[in-house]
Curated annotation (Swiss-Prot):
Biological source species: Chlorobium chlorochromatii (strain CaD3)
PANTHER family: GLYCOSYLTRANSFERASE, UDP-N-ACETYLGLUCOSAMINE--N-ACETYLMURAMYL-(PENTAPEPTIDE) PYROPHOSPHORYL-UNDECAPRENOL N-ACETYLGLUCOSAMINE TRANSFERASE 1
Family membership: Belongs to the glycosyltransferase 28 family. MurG subfamily.
Function: Cell wall formation. Catalyzes the transfer of a GlcNAc subunit on undecaprenyl-pyrophosphoryl-MurNAc-pentapeptide (lipid intermediate I) to form undecaprenyl-pyrophosphoryl-MurNAc-(pentapeptide)GlcNAc (lipid intermediate II).
A single BP term in Gene Ontology: regulation of cell shape
Record EC number: 2.4.1.227
Main location: membrane
Protein's UniProt name: UDP-N-acetylglucosamine--N-acetylmuramyl-(pentapeptide) pyrophosphoryl-undecaprenol N-acetylglucosamine transferase
Catalysed reactions, as listed in the record: di-trans,octa-cis-undecaprenyl diphospho-N-acetyl-alpha-D-muramoyl-L-alanyl-D-glutamyl-meso-2,6-diaminopimeloyl-D-alanyl-D-alanine + UDP-N-acetyl-alpha-D-glucosamine = di-trans,octa-cis-undecaprenyl diphospho-[N-acetyl-alpha-D-glucosaminyl-(1->4)]-N-acetyl-alpha-D-muramoyl-L-alanyl-D-glutamyl-meso-2,6-diaminopimeloyl-D-alanyl-D-alanine + UDP + H(+)
């Protein structure tokens, strides 16, 4: 059996595919797995590093907006898409996969479209509450579409063969909170706030925390992942404190999650899957420039289920710290939110998806 995956550009699209591929080979060691990607995406280095075969195609996403310059650029992009479609048709004929899986990003569009033209079984895994253009268009003819948020269904024209499966994500084993705090050199009996914003960091989160750091540290521990963008600057400006751990990157996320009573972060699909799998209480600040504002849709889904609170990026400077402190001081509200978050969890998402792929091949 052969399975071809397409999804990349960013880790948010690639890592669900990698999790599914690993689970497929665990369930059925004879399955042959390969990936399709671009040389500019994260998949160009990550897929070979993990030992998977990678086929490269040249394709780019359409530019949003309207101007003569953008029109010309989009015409070039459409020409590249047509050329990549021809290449992927040849690839599908030579590789002859039993199932083609798309996990989003513009790289998945030509492969899924070509597979549908050739009558191949296709499975789409959509990570966000607001589906991308590729999912919305190609879901019409997909064998199965798997969504991570039930709200995504209403944006799909063909609602048959749509399943709520969740997002494959890293699974962490919860540890004792006091022991986890000790790993960061923090007091075991203080409420603890975890703030992170991705590898580069989130400037609006950093600015909000820095502006009211003394207020925070007066009553709570803070684990603060600053990211590479502001890391050195903040390190030079912030005074050491026994209640503060800060660094550009957190190596031990399992301990960081376990130490935290409240987590402040963006609303990317992978982060939300990790949070709900652990039943963590979250204060979400959606990235305002995400495509089609999909992070806001993701956050809104959890808010509507009572599983998170949300602060707009534009209001983070004034509202983030007061909201976080209020939540840290309200144990009853945190307990209810934790239960609600756990109800949105899909810790077995990778396994369920792998079994669906195997089922399509039969």
């Amino acid at each position: 059996m052969k399975v071809l995956f397409a999804g990349g550009g960013t880790g948010g699209h690639l890592y669900p595919a990698i999790a599914m591929a690993a689970e497929l080979q665990r369930l059925s060691p004879n399955v042959s797995v390969a990936f399709v990607g671009t040389k500019s995406g994260i998949e160009a280095t990550e897929v070979p590093r993990l030992g998977y075969k990678l086929h490269l195609v040249s394709v780019r996403g359409l530019k949003r907006g309207f101007s003569p310059k953008l029109l010309i650029e989009n015409l070039r992009i459409l020409f590249d898409f047509a050329r990549s479609l021809g290449i992927t048709i040849q690839l599908l004929r030579s590789e002859a996969p039993d199932v083609v899986v798309g996990t989003g990003g513009f790289v998945s569009a030509p492969l899924l479209f070509a597979a549908q033209l050739l009558g191949k079984k296709t499975l789409i895994q959509e990570q966000n509450a607001f589906p991308g253009v590729t999912t919305r268009l190609l879901s019409l003819f997909a064998s199965e579409v798997h969504v991570a948020f039930n709200e995504a269904r209403r944006f799909l024209l063909n609602k048959r063969h749509v399943f709520l499966t969740g997002n494959p994500a890293r699974l962490f084993q919860p540890m004792d909170a006091a022991q986890a705090r000790a790993r960061f050199g923090l007091q075991h009996n203080r409420p603890t706030l975890l703030v992170f914003g991705g590898s580069r960091g989130a400037r609006s989160l950093n600015n909000a925390i820095a502006s009211q750091l003394d207020t925070l540290l007066a009553s709570v521990n803070l684990i603060w992942q600053t990211g590479s963008l502001d890391g050195e600057k903040l390190k030079a400006e912030v005074k050491p404190s026994p209640y503060l751990w800060m660094a550009p990157y957190i190596e031990d996320m399992e301990a960081a999650y376990s130490a935290a009573d409240v987590v402040v972060c963006r609303a990317g699909a992978s982060s939300l899957a990790e949070l709900t799998n652990l039943g963590k209480v979250a204060l979400l600040v959606p990235y305002p420039y995400a495509t089609a504002d999909h992070q806001r849709h993701n956050a809104q889904s959890l808010v509507e289920h009572g599983a998170a609170l949300m602060v707009a990026d534009s209001e983070a400077f004034t509202k983030l710290v007061p909201t976080a402190l209020e939540l840290l001081q309200n144990s009853g509200k945190r307990a209810a939110m934790s239960v609600a978050a756990a109800k949105q969890a899909h810790p077995d998402a990778a396994g369920v998806l792998a079994k669906r792929v195997l089922g399509l091949s039969r």
